[in-house]
Amino acid sequence: LRRRVQLVYQNPFSSLDPRQSVFDIIEEPLLNFDPLPADERRRRVHDMLERVGLPAAVLPRRPHALSGGQRQRVAIARALVLQPQVLVLDEAVSALDVTVQAQILALLETLQRDLGLTYLFISHDLAVVRRISHTVSVMHRGRVVEDGPTEELFHDPQHENTRELLAAVPGRTEIVA
């Protein structure tokens, strides 16, 4: 299961080992779950780095030497190196500024299309949810109270908690039609 489902955390700075280089961070899942020859591991690390839009020059660096967006790209590359089917993205863009957030969302959309990934995208940011999700589940007190196709849920919420959640969004005219 751990090989097929990978997690990308909200704060890449705290989820990346500060003692490891970017190369070591991305390679680590391969060492733990997929015993491959060193040259194949190196190729996969380079492939993932390229796929997430980072130059090879970052490979020897430590996380503290990277920007927030670069760190999140490293976290995504680490999650993808095992070629999972599902990525769980837990508030994966909430710690980023709006410009970098848009870049990471565009990257996630490209990766999903190119790799056929399924995302479980956990977020409180409904604009982000609307952009990235095909279906949405709304939870209240640990229970799913409504789910459905994204546009349907945003245009015609059925559950009171969903309506309240959407009504509470600043500038909600952009969120709810």
Regions found by a protein language model. Give the residues of each.
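Conserved ABC ATPase signature
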Residues: 62-66, 70
